[in-house]
Amino acid sequence: MAPDHRPTRSRFRVQPGDPDNGGDARPEQQRRVIGPGSALGICIGSMIGSGIFAVTGQIGPQLVSPLNIMLAWILAGVIALAGALTLAEVAAMRPRASAQYVVVHEMLGPRLGYVNGMITLLIGYLASMAAVAMIAGAYVARLVPDVDERMIATVLLLGLGGVHAATVVGGTRLNDVLVVLKSAVVVLLAVAGFTVTTEPFVPSTSVLEAARLLEPGSVLATVPVDATAAAIDAHLRTAASPPLLSATLGAAIVAVTFAYLGWSNAADVAGEVRRPGRNVPIAIVGSVLLVGSLYLIVNLVYLRVVPPAAMVEVGPDGRLQPMTSIGAVVAERLLGPVGGRLVTGAIVLLLASTLSVAVMTCGRVIAAMAWKGELPAAAGGLNRRGAPTVAIAAQIAASIGIVWITGLRSLLEYVGVLVTLAVVLTMLSAMLLRHRRPDDPRPFRMPLYPLPPLVSIGLGGWLVASAAAEDWIPVAAAAGTLAAMVAARPLLTRPLEIDDIGDHDGASRAS
């Protein structure tokens, strides 16, 4: 019998009014192959990455006191947990690719749904992927001299993209292995921090000289010249700090939110999770609780070893700058020079794990937007194994472009503001979903409703206001990005019709 080459339109549903469908054109060949452990690993693998090994060193000199630093991490965790409880309810109701995008599109309309999806795509994934790849390249360059950091980042992105484009199951297995490795490294650092005795911390001579010469009013500049190590350590730990709940603290929390990015990633692959009504909420909420606890423990180790005011180093221009490798510095003091190099190598593996998860989930966001008509139809193509090949190729190409055209510091400054705005849109949508469809089945119901979304929205607004008060440039850049997204929408979107779908099965097999 000759093969039937007719379009396989029965594989799709285009039912904008169907609450079970969420109004999206979803290909049924997406397979539910991700188990609860892998779903939890996706979130944990996304969250434990570059943030915990960099952010504390960036905010330490700004906040000065250990209490302020711990409060910043706690409040960022509260925001993440409130968002996780809310999103868990939504993702259990709408278990398909990119549940955040689907619910915002459904509740707030296609325009804000598009903005939410583009923020998640461009900022939460593409920009963060490029940043993590660049950091990984820098760490590799510390271990292997005379290598090009950006070339390393490019090779890493291409390799992980190839794995996840080839197979869905292989990608989750790779992530599972890397999550175990990274968790072991973090636990090892935490255990060493509470069991190894260290000497009082004394900044290097170059740091103290730079402080006295270029920043005479700083805490480091007032360190007594002939003081003992214990006296210097005590001087740094008792320095004056900003008041609690100040704009300075709020702006620092914006930076800390970068370390919590990834708690929502199980919702982005909900269409491929087995028993999503049970497993997706476990993954989302469980990852925030587990990773948040680890973050607090690791920060206690950092603060035990290095006073916040001393978390600085001399930059290429001879001026003091926030410490960029707090994890490596602490590991070297706890484990010695050899241990420091081993931890540097382990951090490269951790960053690879973060990138692995981001590549997996970002492709689903692109595909979901294509099925909605918010991106060209070709971006929604799946291969025979159900992986969004075209979307993965597009995200890898975009991230590599970012790696080669911008610097790391300028890339990260405004990420927190835009991601906070995207979370606020999701929280508003979840509240509207409760109001408009109170009788819809909810496999998971968030506790203490409406407190979780209100906490997330309220604290999110405070963070944006604090960031603007401290430095208006990141907020202005975020506003410009939003304007550009809205302006570009007519060029990227298309009317979604049955005829637009075509022979998706044949197209995906050719990809």
Predicted regions and their residues:
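TM-loop-TM module centered on a large, flexible mid-protein loop between adjacent transmembrane helices
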Residues: 102-104, 109, 142, 214-242, ...
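Membrane-interface "cap" regions at the ends of multi-pass membrane proteins
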Residues: 1-57, 61-66, 81, 85, ...
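Hydrophobic alpha-helical segments and their helix-loop junctions in multi-pass secondary transporters
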Residues: 181-234, 301-306, 428-440
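A generic transmembrane alpha-helix motif of multi-pass inner-membrane proteins
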Residues: 197, 227, 234, 413-414, ...
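Membrane-interface loop-to-helix entry segments
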Residues: 137, 150-212, 261, 284-288, ...
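Helix-loop-helix connectors at the membrane interface of multi-pass transporters/channels
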Residues: 4-5, 10-18, 101-111, 133-153, ...
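C-terminal membrane-solvent junction of multi-pass transporters and transport-like membrane proteins
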Residues: 160, 174-177, 378-389, 423-472, ...
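Hydrophobic transmembrane alpha-helices that form the core helical bundles
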Residues: 58-61, 71, 81-165, 170, ...
